[in-house]
Every structure is written in C-alpha cells, then in structure tokens.
A protein has these predicted regions:
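Structural alpha/beta core scaffold segments of enzyme domains
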Residues: 1-166
Length: 166
C-alpha cells in the first residue's frame, strides 16, 4: 500500500474511522432540489520554519530549571518538561526569545527538544543546548499529512444546505 487510494480500496487505515450521523443524509440528498458531489484532495506539508528547533536548559538552585526554547507554546513546554522530569510546574521556567517564521511548526514540535535538553541537564547538572541540523529536524518533527475525501451535498434553490455526506 503506497497511496491513500490504495489504503481506501483495501480498507487499511491507521486509525479507526469515526462516524457522526444526524438523520438520513442519503435520503435527504436524493430528495434535494440540487445535488453536488466531488472529491477534495490536499497534499502533505512539512513545516519549514526559518530557525531550526533549539532548546537550552540551565539547572538553577533548588532543583529548578531555566529553559530557553524556540517554541510558540511556552506554557505547554513547561508542563511537558515538568512531567518528564517528574517535577512541579513552577520549578520549570521557560523563556522564549524572539522567533519569527514558525508557521505553527514550533507550537508542539519543540517539546521533544526541550525535554531532551532538560533530561540531559538534570543528569549532568550543567547547561545543555540542543540544536539539530535541518535534515534531522525534518525527519524528527511532525507533518500535515495528505488527505482525500469524497463528498455529496444536497441543497435548495436559495443555496441552503439540506444535508451532506463526507
């Protein structure tokens, strides 16, 4: 299985399908004055932020840690690092310098690097900075995956959608 179409034909899905129903969409669409159907495809996408993923953790007094992270979500970085280190949230201080061009790729992708630098800093009891090259960054971080869906919609003369099936 190489393509999404192959997976659909063979009913081989990564996750279990979810079905949300309200009413009898096929009947309503068939009885609608107007009908459209089609297929929507969207290609996959890698986040290509301008600055690669970087995290630096500095041990502080009283088993606290200062983390500099190129993240768009410092509060969640704090929570994840605290959980990984088995510490209270208030023992982790996350600072973010100016970052530009994150395009959403630094919202959740940066946690991994902050956690690794924090584990190493705690173990070594010294500052640890983690900056990986672009190739490894692209391999390690998530993507927006390609998707395809077929749709049918029934609507009235004035454009009111009566029912849809996706």
């Amino acid at each position: 299985i190489i393509t999404i179409e192959d997976a659909i034909k063979k009913k081989s899905f990564v996750l279990k399908s979810k079905t949300i129903r309200r009413g009898k969409s096929s009947t309503v669409i068939a009885n609608s004055k107007h009908r459209l159907s089609g297929k929507l495809e969207c290609g996959g996408q890698d986040h290509f932020y301008l600055e690669g993923q970087i995290a630096m953790t500095i041990p502080q007094e009283d088993n606290n840690f200062l983390i500099y992270s190129s993240t768009q979500h410092p509060s969640e970085t704090q929570q994840i690092v605290a959980k990984v280190l088995n510490q209270k949230f208030n023992s982790i201080n996350v600072k973010v310098r100016r970052i530009g061009g994150g395009f959403g790729g630094k919202e959740t992708q940066s946690f991994f690097f902050a956690a690794i630098s924090s584990i190493a800093a705690k173990k070594l009891n010294r500052p640890v900075k983690l900056r990986i090259d672009r190739e490894d960054d692209m391999i390690m971080t998530g993507k927006r995956h390609q998707f395809i869906f077929n749709y049918e919609v029934g609507f009235s003369d004035n454009g009111k959608i009566m029912s849809s099936k996706i």
